[in-house]
Regions:
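Alpha-helical elements of the RecA-like P-loop NTPase motor core of helicases
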Residues: 15, 19, 41, 61
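CheY-like receiver
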Residues: 39-43, 74
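Structural micro-motif
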Residues: 43-52
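Short alpha-helical
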Residues: 12-13, 35, 69
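Thiol-based oxidoreductase modules, predominantly thioredoxin-like and allied folds used
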Residues: 6-8, 25-39, 47
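Non-catalytic, surface beta->alpha helical segment in thiol-disulfide oxidoreductase systems
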Residues: 54-81
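Local sequence-structure signature of Cys/Sec-based thiol-disulfide redox active-site neighborhoods
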Residues: 1-24
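Generic leucine side-chain signal with a strong bias for well-ordered alpha-helical environments
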Residues: 4-5, 51-52, 74
Length: 81
């Protein structure tokens, strides 16, 4: 499973999230919404960092951060039909 930290590079919250991830996570990749604006459109990430867990099939398995409850419910509804 891959962990993605979605940030906005000029945001103080993002700096704090990156520092937290460096301390707490073994491996993660940073996705800057300024470089990948489609991520912001898909996940609604604007100014608040969001942590995504992506499985081996490229599907988002878990979401933490902004609107996490909404995304997790949408994913659960999609899985359970």
């Amino acid at each position: 499973m891959k962990t993605l930290l979605v940030i906005k590079d000029d945001c103080l919250n993002s700096l704090m999230a990156v520092n937290w991830a460096k301390r707490e996570l073994k491996e993660f990749e940073i996705v800057d919404i300024n470089e990948s604006p489609e991520v912001a459109m898909v996940y609604g990430v604007v100014d608040i960092p969001t942590l995504l867990k992506v499985n081996q099939h490229g599907m988002v398995d878990r979401v933490s951060g902004y609107n996490a409850d909404l995304y997790n419910k949408l994913m659960e509804d999609g899985i359970n039909g």
